[in-house]
Amino acid sequence: NLYLGYAVAALFALFLLVVLLIVIKELSAFARLGRIDRIQHAAETALASADLTAARTVIKDLTGLYAGRDDTKWGRDRLKDREADMFDASALIALADHELLGPLDAAARREVEAAARQVATVTALVPLALADVVAALGSNIRMIRRIAEIYGGRSGTLGSWRLTRAVLSHLVATGAVAVGDDMLEPILGGSILGKLSRRFGEGLVNGALTARVGVAAIEVCRPLPFAPGKRPSVRSIIKTALSGLVTTKSR
């Protein structure tokens, strides 16, 4: 049947078009993530060698990455006005860090706090162990994707898995995998921990793990390395995200 043949050919062409669009999207996502990696490594090299010319190239690439984004326009304008006055690589990169990435860091931190609170709540309230594992995994993957988007690394499906693998590798490399009472007690207090139910305690531990994953994701996705002492404190994030839950539970 001629018409049936045309219909099959049209469906096949449509299928190929969809596949092509997906491939283009994934390649674009990989390219975007790779661009952030290159800027981050170039910034580390410029700082290590105190190379002002290399630092200016980093700033040019960084402003290009965020060109067209309304949430960075004010920072880009301030950076443009002041960068000519900087004659030191570390000072120039610190200026870009403050003006461009400061608001993005705050947004990323809010994402981590929200995800940690959500995971802790779901673990505490859902009695099925497998269900809370699935919920925690989904929350962590969404959090990593959102953090990547905040810093300009739009990730597709394959890009998300690559990013997740990079975050987990970073966690292992920095030894920030485990968390338990020794981490929570200085933050929430030993007397409070002793009053919590087992399930609620598990929720706090899972929330704390999510916070650590979030901080690792920020370090991986951020186009500039953190200056010494500027890295987000996992403990402060845990305290902000989970202390309200503990207060509610302990009443």
Q: Which residues are covered by each model-predicted region?
A:
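Membrane-interfacial hairpin junctions
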Residues: N1-V8
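Transmembrane alpha-helices and immediately adjacent membrane-cytoplasm interface residues
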Residues: A10-D37
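Intrinsically disordered or highly flexible coil/loop and linker segments, enriched in small
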Residues: L20, L52, G68-T72, V177, ...
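Membrane-spanning helices that line or support transport/gating and their immediate boundary helices
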Residues: I22, E26-F30, I150, R212, ...
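Membrane-proximal, non-transmembrane interface segments of integral membrane proteins
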Residues: L27-V119, A124
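Small-residue-enriched, tightly packed secondary-structure blocks
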Residues: H98-G214
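Acidic, carboxylate-rich catalytic segments that either coordinate divalent cations
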Residues: R198-R251
